[in-house]
Amino acid sequence: MLAKRIIPCLDIHNGQVIKGMQFRNHKVIGDIVPMAQRYAKEGADELVFYDITASSEGRVVDKSWIARVAEVIDIPFCVAGGIKSVAQAGEVISFGADKISINSPALNDPYLISRLADRFGVQCIVASIDTWYDIQLDRYQVNQYTGDENRTKVTNWQTLDWVQEVQKLGAGEIVLNMMNQDGVCRGYDLQQLRLVRQTCHVPLIASGGAGTMQHFQEALINAEVDGVLAASVFHKNIINILELKKFLAREGVEIRLC
């Protein structure tokens, strides 16, 4: 059995790490490189960096900080932010990123996923999906341009359909960003994760809602995800990564201990 992954998420804006709640009201948390170093030392298995306004602003993620991060950490990291071509992805990888995450650009150009997978291999291509549960319609909808609350829009894709589509196109991993739970710290949406798990045959990463160590355990065991991504509990020092891993190991989760 492959070890489960603990993945801190760093949302980037104007060269700094920020964090909001339900993808809104973002506040500055700290500087990129020191935070990346801290999480690597604490025992993170991987890091994810989202330049959250790159797509909505029509630009590509700033690559200068990518090189600085690559110099100071020795764990894999994934980068997202306005990547719309093989050439742009190649530049990000050349600066040190191990994986490319595609979100809004893939909704405009789904075959971008295929072109990237053909060039770099499916193991390098992550489909990041921002999913919102619409209570009135009683369904999960994919959202786009979520880094800017004034430009966020609901797409025509229902989440489960898009999960199936990105796999067909060549995504080697899926990160499910559950917007209703984001920053609330009340637990992952286990019902949605179970539904997605049934149709997801590549590694599935849960994102949005972690507030306690038990929340990580529930997602890993009850929803059978391959990894758990979180931000607030790590940024605010509510949970230490090494202590979290020790707890999960005691609970029977296959996990890498440093």
From Swiss-Prot:
<keyword id="KW-0456">Lyase</keyword>
<dbReference type="GO" id="GO:0005737">
    <property type="term" value="C:cytoplasm"/>
</dbReference>
<keyword id="KW-0963">Cytoplasm</keyword>
<feature type="active site">
    <location>
        <position position="130"/>
    </location>
</feature>
<comment type="pathway">
    <text>Amino-acid biosynthesis; L-histidine biosynthesis; L-histidine from 5-phospho-alpha-D-ribose 1-diphosphate: step 5/9.</text>
</comment>
<dbReference type="InterPro" id="IPR011060">
    <property type="entry name" value="RibuloseP-bd_barrel"/>
</dbReference>
<feature type="active site">
    <location>
        <position position="11"/>
    </location>
</feature>
<dbReference type="InterPro" id="IPR006062">
    <property type="entry name" value="His_biosynth"/>
</dbReference>
<keyword id="KW-0028">Amino-acid biosynthesis</keyword>
<keyword id="KW-0368">Histidine biosynthesis</keyword>
<comment type="similarity">
    <text>Belongs to the HisA/HisF family.</text>
</comment>
<dbReference type="GO" id="GO:0000107">
    <property type="term" value="F:imidazoleglycerol-phosphate synthase activity"/>
</dbReference>
<dbReference type="InterPro" id="IPR050064">
    <property type="entry name" value="IGPS_HisA/HisF"/>
</dbReference>
<dbReference type="Pfam" id="PF00977">
    <property type="entry name" value="His_biosynth"/>
</dbReference>
<dbReference type="GO" id="GO:0016829">
    <property type="term" value="F:lyase activity"/>
</dbReference>
<dbReference type="InterPro" id="IPR013785">
    <property type="entry name" value="Aldolase_TIM"/>
</dbReference>
<dbReference type="InterPro" id="IPR004651">
    <property type="entry name" value="HisF"/>
</dbReference>
<comment type="subunit">
    <text>Heterodimer of HisH and HisF.</text>
</comment>
<dbReference type="GO" id="GO:0000105">
    <property type="term" value="P:L-histidine biosynthetic process"/>
</dbReference>
<protein>
    <recommendedName>
        <fullName>Imidazole glycerol phosphate synthase subunit HisF</fullName>
        <ecNumber>4.3.2.10</ecNumber>
    </recommendedName>
</protein>
<comment type="function">
    <text>IGPS catalyzes the conversion of PRFAR and glutamine to IGP, AICAR and glutamate. The HisF subunit catalyzes the cyclization activity that produces IGP and AICAR from PRFAR using the ammonia provided by the HisH subunit.</text>
</comment>
